């Protein structure tokens, strides 16, 4: 039935929103949707090129309208799937996290986007453009160490960050470690 493959892509996009990691690219589904779009386009062109085609014929007009709307719906579903993946890759690039399930084209896109971020951040070395846009609620926070880091020198002294230990520290002192996943805010 028309649109079933595209609907699977939409379901995959919704499922992706709830996952921590981006799932593998659904290449077969994408190819299926593209194939369906080409078939619908060919069918529309064939109908319009027939010698007995009458644009005033309501049945033919309705048939063309349904095929055209199905083609547009497939395109929207495909674009929504691609946009969801691109948005997640952009977020990963800004957060400097790794996405392991990217295909070749997505890896190229991610690399180019990361290079663009480096170019943007280049002249502003004193400003952390990857930081959150929302101001912190508290200057000091409780953190739990997820991975042993060792000794960390801060403005207020030295912390020995061993796994499963907890500290009450300034957010600015441990922000990088939070982003890297060594610490978790409690």
From Swiss-Prot:
CDD domains xrefs: GINS_A_psf1 (cd11710), GINS_B_Psf1 (cd21696)
Gene this chain is encoded by: PSF1
Top-level taxon in the UniProt lineage: Eukaryota
Cell location: Nucleus
GO cellular component: GINS complex
Protein name in the entry: DNA replication complex GINS protein PSF1
Pfam families (alphabetical): PSF1_C (PF24997), Sld5 (PF05916)
Keywords annotated in UniProt: DNA replication, Nucleus
Keyword Electron transport set for record: no
Family: Belongs to the GINS1/PSF1 family.
Location, primary (coarse class): nucleus
């Amino acid at each position: 039935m028309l649109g079933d493959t595209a609907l699977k892509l939409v379901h995959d996009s919704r499922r992706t929103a709830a996952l921590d990691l981006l799932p593998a690219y659904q290449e077969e589904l994408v190819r299926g949707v593209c194939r369906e779009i080409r078939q619908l386009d060919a069918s529309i062109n064939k109908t319009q090129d027939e010698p007995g085609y009458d644009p005033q014929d309501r049945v033919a007009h309705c048939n063309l309208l349904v095929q055209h709307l199905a083609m547009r719906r497939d395109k929207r579903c495909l674009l929504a799937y691609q946009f969801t993946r691109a948005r997640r890759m952009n977020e990963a690039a800004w957060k400097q996290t790794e996405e392991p399930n990217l295909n070749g084209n997505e890896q190229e896109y991610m690399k180019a986007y990361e290079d663009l971020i480096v170019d943007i951040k280049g002249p502003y070395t004193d400003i952390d453009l990857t930081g959150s846009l929302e101001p912190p609620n508290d200057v000091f926070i409780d953190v739990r160490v997820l991975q042993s880091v060792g000794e960390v020198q801060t403005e207020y002294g030295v912390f020995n960050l061993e796994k499963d230990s907890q500290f009450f520290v300034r957010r600015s002192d441990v922000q990088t470690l939070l982003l890297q996943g060594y610490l978790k805010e409690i």
